[in-house]
């Protein structure tokens, strides 16, 4: 669930003596951006990545928006410590992704549509999950342990994330893929639940 910008603004306003960093990696999938607050708060730094909605995972490209003072501090750190400087092909890919607004809009719309369809199907199959404004769903089945589902899916080459941590051990992080990939996930889960008697 995305935190509303108004709630984030309360945190920023209450912590004027600290830098508040807002990570907007998933903002394009349905969240409200805090970028409009940058001019109002000198202590706010908003970061976004090109890895998610702009399909450039692995290139390690993104940006930060903040006051001139905060950006100056970032540049000082970058030039002193950052061994992950961007090369010319990465910069060219980033520029091209910003210029191709049509592709960006289609990609985001497809992910959101597929996510919403998948949520409906998972609900029908007995899963619950927090509301998602991302490109993944953090789903829990009401009767089946997460480890069991993880192993069953993996044995059929369907890969999701699972953590053996007490608070989340029964949940799976399901990334939104193509419509065909999500249909394969749902078809497998339907069959698995039927065979298991759920």
Language-model region placement:
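Short acidic/glycine-enriched loop/turn segments that link adjacent beta-strands
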Residues: 58, 133, 167-170
């Amino acid at each position: 669930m995305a935190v509303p910008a108004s709630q984030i603004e309360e945190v920023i306003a209450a912590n004027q003596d600290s830098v508040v960093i807002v990570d907007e990696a998933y903002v394009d999938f349905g969240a409200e951006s805090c970028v409009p607050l940058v001019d109002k708060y000198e202590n706010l730094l908003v970061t976004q990545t090109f890895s998610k909605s702009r399909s450039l995972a692995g290139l390690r490209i993104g940006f930060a928006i903040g006051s001139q003072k905060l950006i100056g501090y970032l540049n000082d750190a970058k030039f002193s410590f950052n061994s992950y400087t961007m090369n010319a092909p990465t910069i060219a890919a980033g520029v091209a992704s910003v210029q191709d607004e049509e592709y960006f809009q289609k990609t985001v719309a497809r992910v959101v549509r597929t996510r919403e369809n998948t949520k409906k199907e998972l609900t029908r199959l007995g899963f619950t999950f927090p509301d998602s404004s991302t490109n993944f769903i953090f789903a829990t089945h009401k009767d089946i342990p997460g480890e069991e589902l993880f192993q069953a899916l993996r044995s059929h080459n369907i890969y999701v994330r699972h953590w053996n941590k007490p608070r989340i051990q029964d949940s799976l992080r399901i990334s939104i893929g193509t419509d065909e990939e999500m249909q394969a996930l749902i078809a497998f889960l339907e069959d698995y639940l039927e065979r298991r008697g759920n």
